[in-house]
Amino acid sequence: MPLICARPLGRLVPKLGASLRPVLSSHAASPRRPVGVALEQHLGTESWKRFYADHKLDLLALDQKWRQKWAESSREKGNKEDEKNKYVLPMFPYPSGHLHLGHLRVYTIADVIARFQTLQGHKVLLPMGWDAFGLPAENAAIERGINPATWTKANIAKMKEQLGHMNGSWDWNCELATCDPDFYKHTQKIFLALHEKGLAYQAEAEVNYDPVDKTVLANEQVDANGCSWRSGARVEKRKLKQWFLKISEFRESLLKDLETLAKNEAWPERVLAMQKNWLGKSKGATVKFPVLAFGQGTPSAIEVFTSRPDTLFGVQYIALAATHPSVQQLAKSDPELQAFLSTLPGLSPDSKVGYLLPHIRAVNPLAYHEETPEDTKVSLPIYVAPYVLGDYGEGAVMGVPGHDLRDHAFWKEHHYDAPVRFVLAASEDESTTAMPNEPFTEHGVMNANSGIFKGKSSKEAGEMLVKLLEPAGLAKETEKWRLRDWLISRQRYWGTPIPIVHCGSCGTVPVPDEQLPVELPEVDEHWAGKKTGNPLESQTDWINTSCPKCGGEAKRDTDTMDTFVDSSWYYMRFIDAHNKEAPFSPEKAKVLTPVDLYIGGVEHAILHLLYSRFIYKFLMTSSFAGKEAESAEAAESASSEVYEPFKRLITQGMVHGKTYTDPATGRFLKPDEVDLSDPHQPKVVATGALANVSYEKMSKSKHNGVDPTTFIAQYGADATRAHILFQAPVSEILDWDESKITGVTRWLSRVHDLVQKIACSSTSETPSSASTVKAFFEQQQQQPESVADPAKLDASITIWREVQRTISSVTASYNKVYTLNTVISDLMSLTNVIASPSNYDAADPLIRREAVSALIRMMAPVAPAFAEECWHVLFPESSSSSLFSGSGSGSGSGSGDEQAARFPVPDGTEGLLKSRKQTCAVQLNGKTKFAVEIGTPPAGLLEKSAEEKLREFIVGEVLKTEEGRAKLEGRGVDVSKAKKVIVVRGGKLLNVVM
C-alpha cells in the first residue's frame, strides 16, 4: 500500500503489516471507499489519525521511492519514440562535471512543461544529451595529463547522477554525446552533403587566432575588446586556409522567416532583433571616389559602401581597413605603413588610431558638378584605420564626422581643431541640430551645405544623389549583409574530424560514406606530456592515407569542426538516436520536428540559434528529409515552405546568488568569513562590521555559488523545483534565497495534511448520492428548500468555484511558460480555500475529495513524486500505474480510477455555482450605514407578488448578522418600528426609513 509517509506500514505499526492485507483485499477499490475508510474500520478512527499525526512528511523518502518506481516502469514498458507527438527540449549541457543552479532552472522548466503535456494526454519526447566536444575539455585534459575522452565520460557520469536527483522524466534511451563516434559519424555525413552542394568550401582568409588556445576563432567568438571569448587572450590576425559553411546562401530565408517566429510571440522579441541585426541586411549605395596619386601602385579609385548616401556632401576623409588591397600594395613600399600595420593585432577594434597615407588623396564624386559647394570639392585625406572592417562592404568607409559617431571620434582624434561639416538637420528651420561634439545621426532635411538639395528630405536626397552619379559610373544602388560565411575550422584535437583527404593529384577529396566515421586517433603521450597545440598535426600514421579517388598517397585534413556544428543539428538526432544508417529518418522528422518548445539561455540568441536555423533549412531540403535539390540555389528556391527548427523559444533568466562584501575594502567574503547568526544583519567575522549584501551572477571569485545537489539533499527535489519556479517569472533574473523555501515546504505540508484527512475521513459521513461533481450541484438545485443544507452547499460552491478558477488560470500559465511562478501562487491559494475550516468541514465529501484530486493533478508537473504519493493514497486502486502513465482518456472529474489521472479541465459547472450569498447595503433614512453578507433570496421571492415576503426575508437575513443586530435593534433604532422598509435590486439594498 502506498503511504504518504513513504515508509512501510508494517514497520511503523508493529505486527500490523500482515494483518492489513486481508483488510485491503476485502475492501474493493472505490472512489466512495478510500483505503483510509477500510483501515479505520479495522484500527479505529482515532488510532488511525494518531498514526498519521505521528509521522511527518518525508520528501526525501518520496523522491527516492518514486524515482525507483519510475525507473522500474520505464524498464518494463520501454520508451517508444514512434508514439511521441510532442517534443520539449532544453538546450543540452556541456559536461563540466557539476550542475549549477542555472542548469537546475532550465531543466526544471522543461520537465514541468513535459509532465504537464503528458497529463494532457500527449506522448512527450524529453531527451537529454551532452555537448561534449570543445576547448574546455581539451584544456582540462592538458592541465591534468589525461585523455579528454576519459575526462568527459567521467563528467557525464557525474552530471547524469546529479540530474537523476531532480525528479526529471528524461528519455534516457535517446541519450547522446557529441564526442561519440556514433554521433559524429553523422555530423561528418552532413558536412559531406554540404560539401557536395557547394555549401562547404575551403578558402584562404584572414582569421582570428587565439595564441593561448592555439586555434582559430569565428568573428562572433571575439569580444568587443579584441579578446578570445574562451581564454581572454588578445586575438591575432593570421592568414590561413580554412573551411567555411556557406550560410550566406540561406540569408534571405533566415531573415524572412523571422516574421513567422514573431507571430504569437513564439520567439522573444529581443532574440529576433539580435538575429536580424546579425544578419545585417542593409540597402544603400556603392560610391566610387577617384584617387589623386603621386606615386606608383595606387588605385585609380576607391569604392565605398554607404547606407547613407544623403551624407555625401559631408565626407571629410576616407578610411581603409588594414586588409584593403590598396593598403597591402602600398605597404610594400612604405616601411612606416608596415610598422603601423604590425601594431594593429594588439589594438582594440574600436581604437581611433590611424595612419595617414602620404602622397595620395581622394576626390568626392560630387566635386565634378558645378552646383556642389566648394567645401565638398576639396580633396580628401585617406587613412588606414583599425575601426574599418575588412570583411564588410568594400573594406572602406567615407568619413562623415557630422553624421556618424565613430567618424566623429576619429576626426576629432586627428583633426581636433578642424571644423566639422554638417549637411542636414532635424528640420528645415534649423541650421543644425548638432553641436561640434555631437554628430546628428538621424534622417532629416538637407541644409545649405548640400547645395541645390537644400530643403529636401534626406531620404529623397540620397536616392537622387545615387541617380545623379550613376550615369558616370560613380555610384549604384547596392544591398549588403553583415552575415559572413561560417568559419568552422579549428586547429584542435577534441572535435569532429573534417572528413576530407588532400591528394596531390586529385586535390580535395571527400571521405567515402562507407569509411565514416573518421575517428580521432589515440594520442595518450600528448596528454601525458601536457603538451599544447593540435596533436593531429604530428600523427603521421593517422594523417597519411590513400586517396579514395585515385588510390595514391594522400593526407587527412587535420582541422576539426567548430562545436557549434554539433549543436546545430543534435535536436534532429534525438528523434532517431539509434539509426545507424542516417542522422534521422524522414518519417520521424515529419512527426516530431520542428521542436515544439526549446528552452535555454539568451546568451545563445545569435550563434547557436542562427546556425541551427541554417542547418535545419538545409537538412529539410536535402535527401536526409527525403528531398533532393540539384544545387544550393535549388535548395534555397525550394524553401517556399518555412523550415524552422524550433516552433517556440523560451529564454530563462539567470540565477544570481547572495553575495557578501566587506564594506571597508569591497572584498568578496567567503561563507566562513560571514557571521549569519542573525540572518537579517550579516556581519564580517574579522571586524564585526555589517556586511554589504547584494545578488550577483554566481562565480567562484564571488563565493556565492550554490550546489543544487546539496540543496536537493536537504529539502528534496520537489520542494526545490517548486521554490525555483516560485521565486521569479521564467524570463527574469532569479535572486536565489534559500530561506524562502519555507513557504513552499509549508504549502506541501498543508496539502499532505489535506490528503491525510480525506484518506482517514470518518465512516460516519454520509457520501453524496451523486457520482460526479456536476451531478451533485444539479441535485442540489432540484432539492426542495426544506431538505437542502445551505451550509454544505455554500461551502461546496466556494471550494468548487475556486477549483474551476484555478484550473483556467494554471492551465494558461503552464501554456504560457513565462508565468510558471503564478502556478505555485494559484495552487497555494486553492489549498487555502479547501483547507479553510469553514469550507472543509461544511463541504460535501465528494467536493472535498475531487477538489484535492484536482489540486494534486495541477501540482503534479511541479512536484511529481509528492503528487504521485498523494494520488495513490487518495486512490489506492490506481497503484498499478503512475500518475504520468497517460493511459487514461477521461476528463478526470468524479472518479479515482486511471481515467482521472489527467490534467483537470473546466467541467461545465460554472452555471451551477452561483453564490448563495450576496452583499446587502443597508441605509438608514437614505444614507448608507453598513453592508453585510446575507443569504440569496429564493427565486420565488423575486416575483412582484411576493414583495412583502421578500422584505421579511431580507430583514431577517440582515438581523442574523452581528452587525445587523447591533445597528438595527439597538441604540435607538428598531427596524420593527420603522415607518417604511424599502428593498431594492432583489435585496442588494435595504433602506430603513424611521
Curated annotation (Swiss-Prot):
Keywords, A to Z?
Aminoacyl-tRNA synthetase, ATP-binding, Ligase, Mitochondrion, Nucleotide-binding, Protein biosynthesis, Transit peptide
Q: Name one GO cellular component term.
A: mitochondrial matrix
Positions of short motif 'KMSKS' region: 697-701
Could you state one GO biological process linked to this protein? Answer: leucyl-tRNA aminoacylation
**Which residues of the sequence carry a binding annotation for ATP?**
K700
Pinpoint motif 'HIGH' region by residue range.
93-103
Reactions accelerated catalytically: tRNA(Leu) + L-leucine + ATP = L-leucyl-tRNA(Leu) + AMP + diphosphate
Sample GO molecular function, one term? aminoacyl-tRNA deacylase activity
Query: Is Lipoprotein among the key words of this record?
Result: no
* InterPro entries the record matches: aa-tRNA-synth_I_CS, aa-tRNA-synth_Ia, Leu-tRNA-ligase, Leu_tRNA-synth_edit, M/V/L/I-tRNA-synth_anticd-bd, Methionyl/Leucyl_tRNA_Synth, Rossmann-like_a/b/a_fold, tRNAsynth_Ia_anticodon-bd
Q: What is its EC number?
A: 6.1.1.4
Q: What is the annotated localization of this protein?
A: Mitochondrion matrix
Interval spanned by the transit peptide: 1-52
Indicate the family of this protein.
Belongs to the class-I aminoacyl-tRNA synthetase family.
Query: What is the protein named?
Result: Leucine--tRNA ligase, mitochondrial
Specify the species: Neurospora crassa (strain ATCC 24698 / 74-OR23-1A / CBS 708.71 / DSM 1257 / FGSC 987)
